Amino acid sequence: MKKNNERVNTNPSLISKSYNMKKRPVIGTRRHFARKEIESDSDDEDDIFLAGERKKYLQNQSYERRKQKNEHGNNLTLQEELLRHEAYEKNEEIANENDVDQVNLMKYFVHMDNISPVTTNGSLKESLRKYSSIIAVNIFSETGDLKKGIAIFQDLSDAEQAVQYLSNCKIDGRLISATITNHPKRLPNAEHLESSTKTKDESQDKDKLTKLDRAKLEWLIQGLNCEKGSIGNLLCFAVEHVNNHVEITDAFLKEFFNDQPTDDTKVYDDDYINERGEKKLSLIYLMNDILFNGISGTSLVWRYRFSFEPHVERLLDDLYLFSKRLGGRIKEDIFCKKVVKVIEVWKTWIAFQEETLERAWRNFSGNTPQSPQINSAALKVETKNSWTAISEETEGLQDDEEYNGIPVDVNELLNVEFISQIPMSTETSSSSSPQPTEERKAKFKPSFTQGTFVSKRMRMHAEDLF
């Protein structure tokens, strides 16, 4: 027992030295007893000793925390107190126990309005100093000719008395309206207004493309054509920046309706018109691919449909008017057939209003779905008159491509030489076409030569030249 008593008498000095030297606390020595690194005659006495030392250590730690709270508690700003109270209300983790103690002090908030512009924090605090449980007073920035403020009380009775005092006694010539709550309100102070404006600016910036993305979009639109790779690159860009769908849609429409060239001499240039036609078709194909991805379930791509919908009718009307500028019936028919295919796909998807798509389909296809049975006699007369008028204007300008490049026999060409002098309709040409003889077989089938106009520009066989 002597050894134990001696050890008990000497250990407190060692423990105080360990505190001063900031070594590991004595609590950790219990692990050494568990590992049997220190031998003792009685385990019960060791447990009693360690329990006492642990209690001393915890008391010392709590004293240091209280001391730190008293040193820094008065230097806390009102904004920090409000934030800590809000964190405590939301059950968020607080860094240390000092924060919890400080939040527990804030119980009742007195929100003040109609404060005179002359009133300051000091004068208002002097008026409310008679209430002992007051913690903090603060006046926020002016809103017009009024000010708002807040006072924090620990005791409910003091808060109620303060409200009565402010409502009945004028401070700097004004009665202050006050209300009591047990939680802070969002007050329109300068910092809060600045933070709200920052959040609005950030939200607006998210809806806009960056300068680099905007330049990339303009570059992709400028080089857009009907090739799959060109359309695919712009489609990927639109899907990746789906949050900026409004700005991207505006860029598409701006390019689509921009038919005025930089040089006025190109207004009636065939190359420029063909280039614009390809650009418009490529934008229609791009819209079709974007709508398909929206229907197939790609994330948020359906937003583009709502951006396109208000402009679909104007867009299709512009396409129909542009088809009349292509300068040829063949070009116009090819252009209209490509647009009709896209419109039919949109009708099956029910992508836009059915009436708009139906009217556009009639314009481009030239059909009337309401009356599918057409008078055949009237159709023959109409086609006959139209082809007669065209033959008078385009006489002698037939090309080999109309006949797939198949050469014509020399004898047949000589027999029908007089036909080239007179513009003929389909009926007269069919009656005057020569029939093939039995001695020499014709190069064409009767069904091909009948009802056609043979051009002088056909090439001859090499064997017929000698």
From Swiss-Prot:
It is found in: Nucleus; Cytoplasm. Residues 425-436 have a biased composition (Low complexity). SUPFAM superfamilies: RNA-binding domain, RBD (SSF54928). SMART domains: RPR (SM00582), RRM (SM00360). The keyword RNA-binding applies. Residues 188-207 have a biased composition (Basic and acidic residues). Residues 209-368 form the CID domain. This is Uncharacterized protein C11C11.01. It comes from Schizosaccharomyces pombe (strain 972 / ATCC 24843) (Fission yeast). The lineage of its organism: Eukaryota, Fungi, Dikarya, Ascomycota, Taphrinomycotina.
